[in-house]
Amino acid sequence: MPELATSGNAFDKRRFSRRGFLGAGIASGFALAACASKPTASGAAGMTAAIDAAEAARPHSGRTVTATLTPQPARIDLGGPIVSTLTYGNTIPGPLIRATVGDEIVVSVTNRLGDPTSVHWHGIALRNDMDGTEPATANIGPGGDFTYRFSVPDPGTYWAHPHVGLQGDHGLYLPVVVDDPTEPGHYDAEWIIILDDWTDGIGKSPQQLYGELTDPNKPTMQNTTGMPEGEGVDSNLLGGDGGDIAYPYYLINGRIPVAATSFKAKPGQRIRIRIINSAADTAFRIALAGHSMTVTHTDGYPVIPTEVDALLIGMAERYDVMVTAAGGVFPLVALAEGKNALARALLSTGAGSPPDPQFRPDELNWRVGTVEMFTAATTANLGRPEPTHDLPVTLGGTMAKYDWTINGEPYSTTNPLHVRLGQRPTLMFDNTTMMYHPIHLHGHTFQMIKADGSPGARKDTVIVLPKQKMRAVLVADNPGVWVMHCHNNYHQVAGMATRLDYIL
């Protein structure tokens, strides 16, 4: 395993023989072609021209980064348990894709699953027809091929995953890093951390869990705890319930806590840690024992450096932090928030033995970084929104009915939000439910507006707590048809999604 992930794959390449394995499929909640308003021929041509013009305006370096992905069934070793699951080329996580601002990424995908699939490039402000989500991009049928081709305009930590049904709760995910040729930070090493919650091949399948969650006859206790299996505890950071599912395992870079991966560095080195939460239903509180962390980026964009001891990271969020390595062996612990379990990896800079796999460092309970603590760097500010242009994003639903909605409708009957190119609306998040929801907008980032009206962090995914209202400014600069949804995979499939459609 390469220890310094400056290029290539930063993860173990554990390969095992294939075995035909596909669980029961759930139809994609994002196949909107049948229910979406069909544009006229002139309207479609105008949108295509607008998408092409936006692509031409992006920076272009003249370089091309190529990759090949093969989503397929595989047998994977999680560090003891060997599971049948779905992966990109027999590894969890999949291979790192790395580019520099302005590069063109060309990824050829061959679908060896028994169901349609896609690859969504999470957080990248790419051209709409390469987003990897219906209706903008058609799914790839079983046995089919597709080539994604797009330029990358912004540096940052991103990731890729499917956008079909519950495929996001298998092993189909990989990191994407876009380097900044003018990177102002100085560091000696880079450590990519991908968090995950895991049931596939060990516990009930994602499809079985979804069936339990949507069963109108499920036990009353499940309606209040949100946990079909195991015991959960309330989370103060999340405003209550920590999630819907108690998973058998929680992973860092594809490994269970007793078989944690180890990152080797030298005492005194500055390490940039890129943290990605790929989990389907779990937010994590993450800390590195014996170290403080300086948060430098949220969802790829720079913030005023802020020192914390731990971080709350919701599903699909990314944080970049800097640490100065001490001497010894230190666990990096990701507490599954509200679920009384953890994932871990090890930082090894010298002699020593790691503590017990269930060890929880004190730092988890000290200064915990949450989104409202961070402010975008001047270079990342989006400015003020238009004073009279609000876009409502009202989150609704209950655990009892599992009827998650945005603006009162499930995705199948959604009324899309509308913007015109160049507008600067305010996203008005309003969570009327008793659960937290990490809300993600495709193809864009937005800038949070703090409670006092001051500018906050740039985000493409933000946790909206129960009964919380939040605001963010959006710059409409990427024409197309874009999905906005809860990044709890189960809420998303149940209907908590809408669209942001550009009007020409």
From Swiss-Prot:
<feature type="binding site">
    <location>
        <position position="486"/>
    </location>
    <ligand>
        <name>Cu cation 4</name>
    </ligand>
</feature>
<feature type="binding site">
    <location>
        <position position="440"/>
    </location>
    <ligand>
        <name>Cu cation 1</name>
    </ligand>
</feature>
<comment type="function">
    <text>Required for copper resistance. In vitro, oxidizes organic substrates and Fe(2+). May act in vivo by oxidation of toxic periplasmic Cu(+).</text>
</comment>
<dbReference type="InterPro" id="IPR033138">
    <property type="entry name" value="Cu_oxidase_CS"/>
</dbReference>
<dbReference type="Pfam" id="PF00394">
    <property type="entry name" value="Cu-oxidase"/>
</dbReference>
<feature type="binding site">
    <location>
        <position position="163"/>
    </location>
    <ligand>
        <name>Cu cation 3</name>
    </ligand>
</feature>
<dbReference type="InterPro" id="IPR011706">
    <property type="entry name" value="Cu-oxidase_C"/>
</dbReference>
<dbReference type="Pfam" id="PF07731">
    <property type="entry name" value="Cu-oxidase_2"/>
</dbReference>
<feature type="binding site">
    <location>
        <position position="161"/>
    </location>
    <ligand>
        <name>Cu cation 2</name>
    </ligand>
</feature>
<dbReference type="InterPro" id="IPR001117">
    <property type="entry name" value="Cu-oxidase_2nd"/>
</dbReference>
<keyword id="KW-0560">Oxidoreductase</keyword>
<dbReference type="InterPro" id="IPR006311">
    <property type="entry name" value="TAT_signal"/>
</dbReference>
<dbReference type="GO" id="GO:0005507">
    <property type="term" value="F:copper ion binding"/>
</dbReference>
<protein>
    <recommendedName>
        <fullName>Multicopper oxidase MmcO</fullName>
        <ecNumber>1.16.3.1</ecNumber>
    </recommendedName>
</protein>
<dbReference type="GO" id="GO:0005886">
    <property type="term" value="C:plasma membrane"/>
</dbReference>
<dbReference type="InterPro" id="IPR034279">
    <property type="entry name" value="CuRO_3_CopA"/>
</dbReference>
<keyword id="KW-0732">Signal</keyword>
<comment type="similarity">
    <text>Belongs to the multicopper oxidase family.</text>
</comment>
<dbReference type="InterPro" id="IPR011707">
    <property type="entry name" value="Cu-oxidase-like_N"/>
</dbReference>
<keyword id="KW-0574">Periplasm</keyword>
<keyword id="KW-0479">Metal-binding</keyword>
<dbReference type="GO" id="GO:0004322">
    <property type="term" value="F:ferroxidase activity"/>
</dbReference>
<feature type="binding site">
    <location>
        <position position="487"/>
    </location>
    <ligand>
        <name>Cu cation 2</name>
    </ligand>
</feature>
<dbReference type="InterPro" id="IPR045087">
    <property type="entry name" value="Cu-oxidase_fam"/>
</dbReference>
<keyword id="KW-0186">Copper</keyword>
<feature type="binding site">
    <location>
        <position position="442"/>
    </location>
    <ligand>
        <name>Cu cation 3</name>
    </ligand>
</feature>
<feature type="signal peptide" description="Tat-type signal">
    <location>
        <begin position="1"/>
        <end position="44"/>
    </location>
</feature>
<keyword id="KW-0997">Cell inner membrane</keyword>
<feature type="binding site">
    <location>
        <position position="437"/>
    </location>
    <ligand>
        <name>Cu cation 4</name>
    </ligand>
</feature>
<dbReference type="Pfam" id="PF07732">
    <property type="entry name" value="Cu-oxidase_3"/>
</dbReference>
<dbReference type="InterPro" id="IPR002355">
    <property type="entry name" value="Cu_oxidase_Cu_BS"/>
</dbReference>
<feature type="binding site">
    <location>
        <position position="491"/>
    </location>
    <ligand>
        <name>Cu cation 4</name>
    </ligand>
</feature>
<keyword id="KW-1003">Cell membrane</keyword>
<feature type="domain" description="Plastocyanin-like">
    <location>
        <begin position="190"/>
        <end position="349"/>
    </location>
</feature>
<feature type="binding site">
    <location>
        <position position="122"/>
    </location>
    <ligand>
        <name>Cu cation 2</name>
    </ligand>
</feature>
<dbReference type="InterPro" id="IPR008972">
    <property type="entry name" value="Cupredoxin"/>
</dbReference>
<dbReference type="GO" id="GO:0042597">
    <property type="term" value="C:periplasmic space"/>
</dbReference>
<feature type="binding site">
    <location>
        <position position="120"/>
    </location>
    <ligand>
        <name>Cu cation 1</name>
    </ligand>
</feature>
<keyword id="KW-0472">Membrane</keyword>
<feature type="binding site">
    <location>
        <position position="485"/>
    </location>
    <ligand>
        <name>Cu cation 3</name>
    </ligand>
</feature>
